[in-house]
């Protein structure tokens, strides 16, 4: 019981094995054994037994000897147990040392049967050890801080033997060396599993204390010489020194000259050696490298000459972007990321159409501010929303027109040229500039629109004899695109008078002939009707549904007299084709700008009702199913007969009507 009390000051993870129990695990750093592995690993983790490692080997060899005297056992066991608890307790009492002696005796008894073979050797060594270890060394070892010995001992896993020459353990060195040499067989049978390392391993492993001395160079040269020469020369040297290692005759090979890049030429061995420059020092230092390579330079030199230079131009060129102006401007990131000699052929083909679009975008940048300055605040907001460029629908961006909308380019023209000439119908100069802008950007569409331009030009000249004759006549291809469906108050007043004067009776006659509901004065500004018709004629020849209407309009345009050409054409185009054009315009305008954009078609209805109110009443009963509510709502707006009021009422109802008209008008076109 007193022994247990004496053990109390030790840390709980450091409790040694109780004396009477057989041990399962033995700490490889200290003489303690325990039944729980965690205690032993805590020894490793916290470095609790740093000073006892050398003593553990002695204890395995000496203390566990059955034939040693009790005094002989006490003294060597006193040494390890005096040293081992140093990290835990710096001051050890005599009682604790006695308890440690008893623990050592128990271990010696348990290991008795293992040591019968090693009796004579171990007895000799124990006697010498007892003589050579005075108690002063034990006391000094107790007071010694563990960190000093830990610095000397690089690792707990290195077996301690003849190479432990430093510290206060210098006294024990001859005995330890004799122990490790003489009873080698007995040592390995007695030692624990952690120390059962063969002596060849200990002798072969060079300790870190002597790492800076001649032991390491001794092993390096044999290792290099043991390698087969071709293996060493082929893998190690040519990768680094191949340009210098060839004879001059082989370096003048055509193979090297073919693959050598201008960056490599200074490294070719022939100019260096011919000019008297010394060869690189890494080759001069180990002399065996030349000896190894001289043996095998007949066969592998082709491989050195062939493969190494091919790598250099690949990296030198692969990391540089070839100085193609188009690549350096825009696609430097792409060309750097991609292998430069595989892709650059495909880059120009991708870039040239983009450059064409960039030219168009630059032209638009030059020309689009001219109408934008003339537009009011609402048209400015629309100019942000819509893209005034030919070839792109309102849903596409000016840089990248959406390819799905190429079949609806006429719709795109509607919304776009809405923008370019929206509020410019009252001023001829404005329309002229916008016509120029459109002509520049719509050369791709002129072939389609040119054949329809005479009809529209005649209509424009007759309806706008004072305003547009000088503008529309010189620009045949531009005239259909000059159309503004956004009516100003002045234009409305002009065409209210015109429609009231001559179009009322004629329009009634034509309404009887043809489909009533869209018998609207789409020609708010005289161009709006043509805008729908022009864009429709660009669109509908591609669509089978309304192509006969298209031809019918041409014939009527040609045979109608000049004075009534505007209004008769406005009524004739109110057939199914006009329904299609209204659907087209509403689809285009509703997608491009939600607030104002349905002007072209809703102004048709509203202005039809304001200009010719007597036409509204025959129109409502004859309205088609798709336009019933539009007619009903249109009758509500017939009360405002003044052009200014009609415009304000249109603005009020546009946001409401555009969505419903969009849905109503879209259905027959989709079906």
UniProtKB/Swiss-Prot annotation:
GO terms for molecular function: DNA-binding transcription activator activity, RNA polymerase II-specific; promoter-specific chromatin binding; RNA polymerase II cis-regulatory region sequence-specific DNA binding; zinc ion binding. It comes from the Eukaryota. InterPro entries: ZNF750, ZNF750_Znf. GO terms for cellular component: nucleus. It is found in: Nucleus. Keywords: Activator, Differentiation, Metal-binding, Nucleus, Transcription, Transcription regulation, Zinc, Zinc-finger. Residues 67-78, 402-412 have a biased composition (Polar residues). Transcription factor involved in epidermis differentiation. This is Zinc finger protein 750. It comes from Xenopus tropicalis (Western clawed frog). The gene is znf750.
């Amino acid at each position: 019981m007193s022994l247990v009390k004496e053990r109390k000051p030790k840390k709980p993870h450091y409790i040694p094995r109780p004396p009477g129990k057989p041990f399962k695990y033995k700490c490889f750093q200290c003489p303690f054994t325990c039944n729980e592995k965690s205690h032993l690993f805590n020894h490793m983790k916290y470095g609790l037994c740093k000073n006892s490692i050398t003593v553990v080997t002695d204890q395995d060899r000496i203390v566990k000897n059955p034939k040693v005297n009790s005094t002989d056992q006490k003294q060597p066991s006193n040494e390890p147990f005096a040293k081992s608890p140093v990290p835990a307790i710096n001051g050890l009492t005599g009682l604790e040392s006695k308890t440690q002696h008893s623990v050592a005796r128990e271990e010696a008894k348990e290991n008795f049967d293992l040591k019968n073979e090693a009796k004579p050797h171990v007895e000799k060594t124990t006697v010498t050890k007892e003589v050579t270890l005075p108690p002063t060394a034990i006391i000094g070892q107790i007071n010694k801080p563990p960190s000093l010995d830990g610095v000397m001992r690089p690792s707990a896993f290195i077996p301690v033997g003849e190479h432990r020459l430093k510290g206060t353990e210098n006294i024990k060195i001859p005995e330890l060396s004799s122990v490790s040499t003489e009873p080698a067989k007995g040592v390995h049978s007695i030692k624990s599993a952690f120390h059962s390392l063969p002596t060849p391993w200990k002798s072969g492993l060079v300790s870190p204390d002597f790492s800076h001395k001649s032991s390491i160079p001794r092993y390096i040269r044999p290792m290099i010489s043991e390698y087969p020469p071709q293996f060493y020369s082929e893998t190690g040297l040519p990768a680094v020194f191949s340009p210098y290692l060839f004879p001059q005759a082989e370096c003048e090979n055509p193979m090297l000259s073919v693959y050598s890049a201008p960056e490599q030429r200074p490294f070719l061995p022939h100019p260096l050696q011919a000019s008297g420059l010394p060869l690189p020092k890494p080759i001069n230092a180990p002399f065996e490298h030349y000896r190894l390579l001289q043996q095998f330079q007949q066969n592998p030199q082709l491989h050195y000459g062939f493969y190494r230079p091919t790598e250099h131009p690949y990296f030198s060129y692969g990391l540089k972007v070839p100085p193609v102006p188009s690549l350096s401007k825009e696609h430097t990131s792409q060309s750097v990321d991609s292998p430069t000699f595989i892709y650059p052929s495909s880059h120009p083909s991708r870039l040239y159409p983009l450059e064409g679009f960039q030219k168009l975008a630059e032209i638009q940048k030059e020309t689009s501010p001219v109408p934008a300055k003339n537009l009011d605040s609402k048209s400015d907001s629309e100019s942000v929303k819509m893209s005034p460029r030919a070839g792109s629908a309102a849903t596409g961006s000016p840089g990248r027109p959406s390819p799905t909308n190429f079949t609806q380019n006429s719709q795109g023209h509607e919304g776009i040229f809405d923008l370019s000439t929206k509020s410019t119908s009252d001023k001829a100069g404005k329309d002229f500039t916008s016509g120029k802008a459109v002509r520049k950007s719509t050369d791709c569409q002129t072939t389609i629109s040119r054949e329809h331009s005479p009809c529209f030009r005649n209509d424009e000249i007759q309806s706008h004899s004072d305003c547009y004759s000088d503008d529309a006549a010189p620009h045949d291809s531009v005239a259909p695109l000059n159309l503004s469906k956004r009516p100003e108050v002045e234009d409305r007043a002009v065409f209210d008078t015109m429609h009231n004067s001559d179009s009322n009776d004629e329009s009634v006659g034509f309404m009887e002939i043809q489909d009533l509901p869209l018998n609207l004065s789409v020609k708010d500004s005289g161009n709006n009707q043509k805008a729908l018709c022009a864009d429709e004629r660009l669109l509908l020849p591609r669509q089978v549904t309304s192509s006969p209407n298209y031809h019918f309009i041409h014939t009527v345009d040609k045979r109608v007299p000049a004075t009534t050409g505007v209004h008769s054409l406005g009524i004739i185009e109110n057939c199914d084709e006009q329904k299609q054009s209204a659907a087209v315009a509403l689809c285009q305008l509703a997608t491009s700008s939600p607030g104002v954009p349905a002007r072209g078609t809703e102004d048709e209805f509203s202005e039809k009702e304001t200009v010719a109110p007597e036409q509204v009443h025959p129109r409502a009963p004859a309205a088609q199913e798709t336009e019933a509510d539009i007619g009903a709502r249109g009758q509500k707006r017939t009360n405002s007969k003044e052009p200014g009021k009609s415009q304000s009422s249109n603005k009020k109802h546009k946001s409401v009507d555009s969505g419903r008209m969009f849905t109503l008008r879209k259905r027959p076109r989709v079906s």
